């Protein structure tokens, strides 16, 4: 019985350690909060419609520039990610509440936020 209990405690500890891989560090959060697209019009749209979720770790949205949050999504392909941005998915509202974003804007913003991540 003690052996089983010890193994269970060890397993829970290991799970706790591995879960932190997807948790952004303070530097990741600072980078997400400071990042802006180089295009001024796109930067304005990002600040207005994307940052409230994608620069806040507790929002549940993938953090801008944080590779572990984007790899699984990028594996689905950019077209699928842009479709999810346009139509909405789970807590993501349709168009990210950027009603004046064109399809090209949505693609550019998605590419910007997922930059650095590779499938």
Region locations from a protein language model:
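Electrostatic cytochrome c docking/interface patches
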Residues: 22-45, 59-68
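Axial heme c-ligation environment in periplasmic c-type cytochrome domains
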Residues: 61, 84-117
């Amino acid at each position: 019985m003690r052996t089983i209990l010890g193994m269970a405690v060890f397993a829970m500890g290991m799970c706790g350690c591995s879960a932190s891989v997807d948790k952004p560090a303070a530097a990741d959060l600072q980078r997400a909060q400071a990042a802006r697209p180089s295009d001024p019009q796109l930067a304005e749209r990002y600040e207005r419609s994307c940052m409230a979720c994608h620069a806040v770790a507790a929002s549940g949205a993938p953090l801008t520039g944080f590779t572990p949050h984007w790899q699984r999504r990028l594996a689905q392909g950019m077209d699928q990610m842009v479709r999810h941005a346009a139509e909405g998915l789970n807590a993501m509202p349709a168009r990210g509440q950027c009603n004046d974003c064109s399809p090209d804007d949505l693609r550019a913003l998605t590419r910007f936020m997922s930059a650095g991540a590779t499938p």
